[in-house]
């Protein structure tokens, strides 16, 4: 099956609560590649690449609130063109 890549922009209380690291662990369990990074507007950008079902599962996890320490108010999703990431990293 072909890989897909999706960018998710997660808004709410998502910085300073371990959100990127929890997302990295969840992505690794789903065998996804990509990255998570804090944005200047207080959101977190998550780019995930891999099997379509696994990407959907990560997006659903994000929408359900991610880690317990976070509060997710909304998640905006858009397609992302690049699929050839090596592992899932935290970007600064």
Curated annotation (Swiss-Prot):
InterPro entries: Acylphosphatase, Acylphosphatase-like_dom, Acylphosphatase-like_dom_sf, Acylphosphatase_bac, Acylphosphatase_CS. PROSITE patterns: ACYLPHOSPHATASE_1, ACYLPHOSPHATASE_2, ACYLPHOSPHATASE_3. Gene3D superfamilies: 3.30.70.100. Residues 5-92 form the Acylphosphatase-like domain. Transmembrane segments: none annotated. Its EC number is 3.6.1.7. SUPFAM superfamilies: Acylphosphatase/BLUF domain-like (SSF54975). The active site is at residues 20, 38. The keyword Hydrolase applies. One of its GO terms (molecular function) is acylphosphatase activity. This is Acylphosphatase. It comes from Pectobacterium atrosepticum (strain SCRI 1043 / ATCC BAA-672) (Erwinia carotovora subsp. atroseptica). The gene is acyP.
